[in-house]
Amino acid sequence: MALFPLHHEVPCKGEVLFDSNGLRRFSSGLKHRTMAEATTLGRDCRMKSYMKSIPYCRSPRRRLCLVRASSENKITKQRLKLLDSYFGKLQNDDEKPSISTGDDIDRKAELNVNEELDSLSAYLDKLQKDAKSKGLVSSTLDVVKSEGGSVASKLRKTGIENNNSPFQQFDDEDQAEDTLNFYAVSILASINVGVCLFEAAAPVRNNNMGLLSLPLLYGAKINDLILAGEWWRLVTPMFLHSGIPHVALSSWALLTFGPKVCRDYGLFTFCLIYILGGVSGNFMSFLHTADPTVGGTGPAFALIGAWLVDQNQNKEMIKSNEYEDLFQKAIIMTGFGLILSHFGPIDDWTNLGALIAGIVYGFFTCPVLQLGSGGSERQEGIVTVGPEKQNSADPCKSFLLFTIFVAVIVTSLLLIGDGPLDFPTYDDVVYSLI
């Protein structure tokens, strides 16, 4: 039986290795090769013991073959040891990438957090520089970088999340201002209701005018008495009403449009609009009719006119649904005013004159809202929505325009002197349009 050596291509140290996919295929084939070599080694050992029992095999040539076979067996064992060490090293290398990958992810996440904190710190520093009003920034805006810290914990250190933040201050100021405005409007509505109750409680009979009340007797718009020097009759009719429906309509309009106008124009300008609307409406009634009238709804129409101007100039900053709701209420109030004018001493010229006065006066005093930063320069008559916002018109400008309007009315009254002019009546104007 002849002997022959088995040669296998086994990767040794220093040789080129396969990739991961090729390595799996190589390892599966290597098992079969290893089993074949083990079978060959067993067969060689049996053959070696058999050869010792045969005298012929003790010749030098046969001994050389046995030495060669034993040397090849040693080489095979060495290669198997190299394979074992290689597979052990390969297994360790497979576990290391997951650890290194996790470390890389942690480093990237930490770098991203640090970059976000840097950008946030720069933004807060810019806000701090732009803030000019006192008490706008509650605390020093500094972001401390530390390992394992989160953005939320660092923001808590800046003082933004506490109750003294700039946005919280703005909300508190707006709420306090709205409360003050509502109180002012409620006081005016209470005065109207109180005067109406006093009218019902103090009836007076006059020979020329019939049954009147004490407030109507001394405060209604009567042209002859105005020309005689009782100029206050251009002011007092704005607080007089012809009955419960009239005062209810006036109070409802005042409580609906009053807070809006008061918030947009300011409390001082709101009061000037209210007074100017009443005076202008009574003056318009003085020019067009000689009948005694009251004008309690005149100031309400002046507020509607000022509100319309504000909605037109700031339409991009106002919600459409709120505008539509109030516009419908304005139409309803106008319709009820026209109906009530046929059931009492209410002159439609009073409402029309007050509406025109509110529109004209509001056009010159209405603040224009625009978005901008706190560091920008504030222009005259423009409200900046931001850290330096101003929720009212310029009081000096409003008072100056109010003085001009009153001066024009007084001058016109002095120039007329002989009583109302020969203007067409309100019904004539309506019928001519139809």
Swiss-Prot record:
Which enzyme type, at the first EC level?
Answer: hydrolase
Please give the superkingdom of this protein's source: Eukaryota
* Presequence boundaries: 1-68
Any one Pfam family match given in the protein's UniProt record, by short name: Rhomboid
Q: Could you confirm whether the keyword Hydrolase appears in this record?
A: yes
Q: Provide the protein's localization.
A: Plastid, Chloroplast membrane
Mode of membrane association = Multi-pass membrane protein
A GO term for molecular function: serine-type endopeptidase activity
What EC number(s) are associated with this protein in UniProt? 3.4.21.-
A GO CC annotation given for this chain: chloroplast membrane
Kindly list the residue ranges recorded as spanning the membrane.
182-202, 209-229, 238-258, 267-287, 289-309, 326-346, 352-372, 399-419
Q: Name one GO biological process term.
A: proteolysis
The free-text function statement in the UniProt record for this protein reads: Probable rhomboid-type serine protease that catalyzes intramembrane proteolysis.
Write out the similarity annotation. Answer: Belongs to the peptidase S54 family.
Q: What is this protein called?
A: RHOMBOID-like protein 9, chloroplastic
Q: What would be the name of the gene that encodes this protein?
A: RBL9
